[in-house]
Amino acid sequence: MHIEGRNAVKEAILSGATIEKVMASNSAKDATFEEIVRLAKSKKLKIQFVDNGLLNKTSQTGKHQGLIAVTTEFKYSTVSEILNVSRSNNKDAFILILDGIEDPHNLGSIIRVCECFGVDGIIIGKNRACSVNETVIKTSAGATSYVKIAKVTNINQTIEDLKKNNVWVYGCELGGEDINSVDYSGDCAVVIGSEGFGTSKLTLKLCDKIVTIPMCGKVNSLNASVATGIAINTIYTKKNR
């Protein structure tokens, strides 16, 4: 797998990710580029200086910014490992469940939001959903190095398992209670549905409560990553008052 772009490569190095080598442009000389190269050298990483033509051929995103880190495949966490984040830090669990997000740019943006607002981990499905790839990592600006992500076979079964662990599950969908009026104390998870179809009916039935982002415009839907950002920020703010 390739990690592309300056922020993503820098955060991968800082997080201690397994990096086989760093491919670096032999023509880039700016301060930010040089800082990352020095960081890679300080970690004793292999650095291969190449021309931009080779970087362009190697790049999966077309936006390498002169740096590509060659790594092992992305390592997913387990749901238990996500739950252990809060347990080990003696705090309430805060988990995001994604029901069928297919766009890698949306997934990358969502991971970035989750890292900013202290989400313990993200749960995604194995089927009909985007996995963590080069575009996701690049769009996340390196947040994939810090947020635990679990890939599960059955989202609904996972929700039932979380509820058995005393995690209160909120579905973010139209027709629910105002998201701003809910008390989110205790362990909680929020479910965000897919870009085109929202959250499945069965999944919504399993949620303990449906919450809705209030809107006043004529268009009554939001991009999945935007909706996630609003929901996560709202819950984070209420949990930390």
Which residue stretches match the model-derived regions?
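N-terminal positively charged helical leader segments and presequences
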Residues: 1-85
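RNA substrate-binding interface of SAM-dependent RNA methyltransferases
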Residues: 11-17, 84-177
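Surface-exposed amphipathic alpha-helices with a cationic face
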Residues: 41, 159-163, 236
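Short hydrophobic alpha-helical runs that function as membrane-insertion/retention elements
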Residues: 48, 122-125, 212
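Structured adenosyl-cofactor binding patch, chiefly the S-adenosyl-L-methionine
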Residues: 137-143, 201, 205-241
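Active-site/ligand-binding-proximal alpha/beta "capping" segment
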Residues: 170-223
